[in-house]
Amino acid sequence: MRLTKIIPKIFYEDFKDGLHLFVDGLKFKVVYNDAKLYIIIRDDVTIQLLEDAEYAAKDRPEIRIETDDIAAFYKEVKEAHPELLHPNLNIVKQQPWGLKEFALLDKTTVCVIIQQQ
């Protein structure tokens, strides 16, 4: 038996903010949606977006997504939606702990760090 993935839930007051970050900015595809839930997928990564103002006010997460080609991923984001790049990590940076990283930040302060080993 083994664990195969983690699927985060991210709460938004308004879905459009999450869809801008993940669908427009990171090119996730919507595979399901209803009045309170979107399930989005890109490659092997699945995320659930939930519309709930109470929980959105309580939790603005930071998540990490690993890629095998950070330069191409960065180029894709920078060309399509540079406004989503995090002001504190808006270039690909080699970190002292061995990862290459850049980050995105939406207007609700959900942070997504893209990393490569």
Sequence positions of predicted segments:
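Conserved active-site tyrosine of GNAT-family acetyltransferases
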Residues: G18-D24, V77, T109
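Conserved acetyl-CoA-binding loop of GNAT-fold acetyltransferases
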Residues: G25-V30, H81-E83
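Conserved short beta-strand elements that form part of the metal-binding/catalytic scaffold
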Residues: K29-P61, C111-Q116
